[in-house]
Every structure is written in C-alpha cells, then in structure tokens.
Amino acid sequence: MRMRELAAVMAGVTFGMAVMPDMTVLAADNNMDYRRKVVGIAGIMNNTSTGLNDPVTRAEFANMLVKASTYRDYLPATSSVSVYADVPVTAQYASSIRIAAEQNWITGYLGGLYKPDQSITLQEAARGILALLGYTSEDFGSSLSSARMAKFYNLELNENLDRQPNEVLNRSDCINLFYNLLKTDYKTTGKAYATVLGCELNSDGEVNPLGLADTNLKGPKLVTKGSQIGDYVPFNVQEASIFVNGDASSYEALKSYVSSSYVVIYYNQTAKTIWAYIADEDVQSGRCAVRGTVENIYYSSSDVMTPTSITLDDGQEYKLSSSEMQFAFSVYGSIRVGDRVTLICEKSENSNGDATYTVVDYVED
C-alpha cells in the first residue's frame, strides 16, 4: 500500500554529508547511521540498532555472508548435514556455516572443527568478502594471506574499518565491512555488488537500497496501546533493527512507547527492520503520526471531485498531494467525515515556524 511514497524515507536515503571542518563528527555519525540502515534493509544483519560493540562470532559471520549472497533465497531454517564436529545440525547457524564452508568463503580448523563461538578476525572476514566478490585462491598466488589483504586494502574494503588483520570484529565493524562490499565492483561484471541484492548506487557512489525497501516494505499497521508488538510482525521483534520517529532505537524503547501510546509501524521482513511512529508525538520535522476524527474534507474550486486537504478534530489542516491520498478521501474512497483515522504525515516548517502537514499514508480504525 502506497509504497513508492514511503520507500525513500524508510530506506533513509536522504542523509547528507557534512563538509564543513567543524562538522566532522556529525558527518561521521550521519554516515554510520546511513550505513546501518542500508545493511539492515539489505537483510545482511538482523539488528543494526543495538549491541554495536559486541564481538561477532564465526557462526554469526557465516550467516552474514550467506545473507549477503544469492544463497539467501535458499537458506533453510535447519540443516540436514553437519560439516564440522562442533556444529551440530541443530545449531542456530548450522545451515549458514554449511553453505559458507561449501563455497569456501570461510574455513575450519584442524580436527574438523569450526569454532563457531570464536570471534571473527579481519583476516578471516576479508577472505569471505573477497570470495563474494568473485575472487578465488588462484587470484592470490602462493602468499595467500598477504595477497588477500593487499587486494582487500586496494579495493578500499577497509573504509571506516580501523582494524589490524588479526583483530576481532564487532557488529559496528561488520556494518562498515558489508556496506563497503555493496559499493565495490564484482570481479567479473564490473558492476557494484549491491546489484546482486537488488540495490544500486546513487550518483555520489553511495548505496541506495530504495528498490529493496520499495519491494519488501509492509504496513502501515496501527499497534494499539498496551499491545504486544510481536503480534504485528512475522519475526522476532527482539532481533529486529528498530527506528522510532526516524532515529535508531531498541526493542525496550519501542515496548515502552506501545505501553502508553498508539504506534504506527512499517516493517521489512527480509531485513527484520521496523520503522515506528508514535501517534501524536510532536516532532520538529519529518515523518510523524496523528490520530483523530475527520471533521472536514476540502476540495479545490476548480475540481470538486479531488480533495486537497482535510482537518481532524484537532483543528489542524492536513494536505493531500498524492493521487492515492486524494482518492482515499474522495467520494470514491473509503474515508468519510466522522471516521476515526491515523494519518502518517510529512511535517515541514517555514522560517516563521509555521508547520505544514502532508498526508502520505493512513490507517483506518
């Protein structure tokens, strides 16, 4: 429903890069926030909002590699084969470890062990990333480890990644690593790896996941006050990346909001990402949700069939600019004066502080 208007905001593609010297820290923060959203929407990592300093295990990294590949569409929930003595078929990431091992993206240890709970190092991770890009052992001659790392640095896969080869990676490092992967050209095609997952690059060379967000975004859904969030999405909310009113948040924070407020959510099942908007919470600008009863529907004097705005019982005017919203509130649509609705709006303010609300979506009570 109404996905094209929403996808750009969900994907977070509007981040700008600060260029003034005294804005360096802000620029870095914005860049990381953008990367988190892209990697989350791409479905590579389940939760890009919390635990960013937590080390990533070899089992988790194998799962990330598979989810960053075309094998993601064939990843079974359980594995029927155990390829390592310390990875039983019942292990959480057994299927991903099997695929990663079969594709030679990541290797085990002597004695048939994988050591799934051991933290992944940059050198191990680099092997997997280069393999996804189409590089094999034949590309690196006899000095495999050093040649791989040289290629890794040459491709600038270490951008925003300040680790030595033998250092372990945390979740923040992996966000940067996989974002860099998406920007890097595939060995044989010369096209950005992002295209493998249905993304593309913007004109400035950054990843634009708009296609993924547009295709897989579900919603809006109105989560009633005091409800269980898990009843509204088809995945474990505690493993999700969560954004509240456009900012990175957490399950506990969203749970707290739902306990006392109505909340509108959108979600991407592939990426396990939730975008939530707290109803009637004041925001300076950007996306917001408003609940109320429709009091008036206004039409243009030149076109009495096409509504241009509505008012709710709060007295505020809400503009209708898209054809979908105009149809929904027209005589042909489903909304009438007196109906209870929740509007999802884009709020902007002029230099005088006067606010304008434009309706981009709605939920009928």
Named regions from a protein language model:
Residues N268-G286, K347-D365:
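OB-fold/S1-family single-stranded nucleic acid-binding modules
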Residues E167-S172, L177-Y179:
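Structured, solvent-exposed acidic/aromatic patches
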Residues R2-Y34, G40-A62, V66-Y93, Q103-Q123, ...:
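Feature responds to low-complexity, polar/acidic, surface-exposed segments characteristic
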Residues S301-T311:
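Short aromatic-glycine-enriched beta-strand elements
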Residues Q316-E324:
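A short macromolecule-binding patch
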Residues D247-I265, Q326-I344:
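Short nucleic-acid-contacting surface segments enriched for D/E, G, S/T with interspersed K/R
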